[in-house]
C-alpha cells in the first residue's frame, strides 16, 4: 500500500515515487495498490484518484478508523473539513455505494501479478 500519484502533499508524492522504485517488478512485491487521503488526494486535478479496487467495510470498521484517526489531533477537524468524522463516514458510504455495499474503502491497483 502506498499513497496515490494524485496526492497533492509533497511528502506523499515522494513516498509514492520511492515506493514505485522500491517495488519494481523484480522486487518480489506482487501487488501494489494506492489509497486515497482525504484533503490531499482529491486535490490532484491533473491526475484524479480513480479507484478500481474496493474493500467492503462494516460500521464497526468505520468506528475503528475514526477512533484511530482521532489520535492525529492536528489532522482531524470539525465538519465540513474532509478529515472529520462525518466526512470519513460519508466517503465510506459513497465508496460502498460504488461497489454495492453499505461501506467500503477505495484503492487503485498500480501493479498486480497473478
Please report, for each region that a protein language model flagged, where it lies by residue.
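Metal-dependent de-N-acetylase/amidase catalytic core
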Residues: 1-114
Amino acid at each position: 500500500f502506498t499513497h496515490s500519484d494524485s496526492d497533492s502533499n509533497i511528502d506523499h508524492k515522494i513516498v509514492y515515487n520511492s515506493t514505485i522504485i522500491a517495488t519494481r517488478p523484480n522486487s518480489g512485491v506482487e501487488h501494489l495498490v494506492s489509497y486515497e487521503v482525504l484533503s490531499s488526494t482529491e486535490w490532484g486535478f491533473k491526475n484524479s484518484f480513480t479507484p478500481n479496487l474496493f474493500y467492503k467495510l462494516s460500521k464497526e470498521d468505520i468506528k475503528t478508523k475514526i477512533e484511530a484517526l482521532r489520535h492525529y489531533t492536528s489532522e482531524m477537524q470539525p465538519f465540513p473539513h474532509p478529515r472529520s468524522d462525518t466526512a470519513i463516514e460519508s466517503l465510506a458510504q459513497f465508496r460502498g455505494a460504488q461497489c454495492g455495499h453499505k461501506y467500503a474503502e477505495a484503492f487503485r491497483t498500480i501493479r498486480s501479478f497473478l
